[in-house]
Amino acid sequence: MLSAVARGYQGWFHPCARLSVRMSSTGIDRKGVLANRVAVVTGSTSGIGFAIARRLARDGAHVVISSRKQQNVDRAMAKLQGEGLSVAGIVCHVGKAEDREQLVAKALEHCGGVDFLVCSAGVNPLVGSTLGTSEQIWDKILSVNVKSPALLLSQLLPYMENRRGAVILVSSIAAYNPVVALGVYNVSKTALLGLTRTLALELAPKDIRVNCVVPGIIKTDFSKVFHGNESLWKNFKEHHQLQRIGESEDCAGIVSFLCSPDASYVNGENIAVAGYSTRL
C-alpha cells in the first residue's frame, strides 16, 4: 500500500528550468522579533511542528509545545531548553476536549494571554481509498485534522483577542495535488484551506490574522516511505525544480514571518512551501 502512496507523488513534478544554486533553509537571524509573545504549537515534538516551535522560541517567543505522549514532550523539552529557549510542554491529544483545556491552562500559566496558535497536529491512520474508508477512520481524521484546530481556537479565543496575534494552520500539498491512497487525508487537508479563509474573515475584527502553511514533500517521519527508498528519493530530487527535498526548517521560517509584524497585512492566505508553484 505504501508503494501506492509513493507512486501518487510522482506526477507532482514537471520539467522546467532548474536553479543551479542550492537554496539555504537557515534563514536570516531574526532573534527578538517575537520577544514577549506567547505561542502554542500543537504536534510540536518532532518534524515540522518541532522546527516551528524551535524557530518561534529562537525568535524570542515563549512557546508551549504538546504531543500525545509524555516521553515525546520530555525529549523535545530537553532539546529546546538545552538551547536556552523559553518553552513549556504538556501532553495533549487535540481531539480530546479535556486535553485541549489543559493545554490552554498551561499556556495561561505564564502571562495570562496567548498571541500565536500554530496547529501542526495531524493524523493519517489509513493508507487506502476514500470510498473504502470506514466511518470510524473518517471521523478520526476529520476530528484531529480539521475540527480540533477550530475547537482549540475557540477555547483560546478569549485570551487572544486584541493582541495583534496570529493563527497558523498547517495543511499539506496534498490539498492541491491529492495523493493516491491518502484519500481522506487529502480531503482533510483541503478542508483546512477553506477553514483558513473562513476564520480569517471572522477573526479580523478581533485583530487576529489567520493564514495557512502548505508544506510540500518534507523530510520527516511522515514521509519516510519516500526518503527510506534511496532510488525513489533520488528520483524525486532530480525532478524537483530546486533539485532538493524540503527540510522542516523550510516551513519554520515562514511561520515565524506570519506571526511577526512584517506580516501584519497578510491574512487568509494559503502559502505553499513546496519548492514549486501550485497555482497561478
Swiss-Prot record:
Modified residues (N6-succinyllysine): 96, 219, 237
Pfam families on file: adh_short_C2
Inducing stimuli: Up-regulated by IL4 and CSF2 in monocytes/macrophages. Down-regulated by bacterial lipopolysaccharides (LPS) and TNF in monocytice-derived dendritic cells. Up-regulated by MYB.
Active-site residues, as the UniProt record annotates them: 185 (proton acceptor)
Modified residues (Phosphoserine): 223
Highest taxon of source: Eukaryota
EC number(s) given by UniProt: 1.1.1.-
Keywords, ordered alphabetically: Acetylation, Mitochondrion, NAD, Nucleus, Oxidoreductase, Phosphoprotein, Transit peptide
PROSITE patterns xrefs: ADH_SHORT
Presequence extent in this chain: 1-23
Record: residues binding NAD(+): 46, 48, 185, 189, 220
UniProt enzyme class: oxidoreductase
Any single GO BP term: response to toxic substance
N6-acetyllysine carried by residues: 96, 219
GO molecular function annotation: carbonyl reductase (NADPH) activity; oxidoreductase activity, acting on the CH-OH group of donors, NAD or NADP as acceptor
Subunit architecture: Directly interacts with MDM2; this interaction occurs in the nucleus and does not target DHRS2 to degradation.
Family of the protein in this entry: Belongs to the short-chain dehydrogenases/reductases (SDR) family.
PANTHER family given in the database record: DEHYDROGENASE/REDUCTASE (SDR FAMILY) MEMBER 4, DEHYDROGENASE_REDUCTASE SDR FAMILY MEMBER 2, MITOCHONDRIAL
Protein name in UniProt: Dehydrogenase/reductase SDR family member 2, mitochondrial
Species annotation: Homo sapiens (Human)
Gene from which the chain derives: DHRS2
